[in-house]
Amino acid sequence: MLRINVCFDASKKVPAKIQQALRAEIEKEILSNYERGVVSVGKGSSAEVSISGVDDDEKKVIMQKLEDIWQSDSWLP
């Protein structure tokens, strides 16, 4: 099962609506291609992205899609 975890640095104070919008966009653009998957977006002690449950080649593809989502502003509320 695919798992995507996105953590924002808690000191950056990213609004909850931004986190929710990012989660929804990841679910729409990435999870829709997988039978099972989980996306978690929240705050942590540092900014990080982790992907598990897929092989290394698939991780690279997913990471590129995540970068494309992040660089696009169409998902921002």
Swiss-Prot record:
GO terms for biological process: DNA repair; SOS response. InterPro entries: DinI-like_sf, DNA_damage-inducible_DinI-like. Gene3D superfamilies: DinI-like. Keywords: DNA damage, DNA repair, Plasmid. Pfam families: DinI (PF06183). Belongs to the DinI family. This is Protein ImpC.
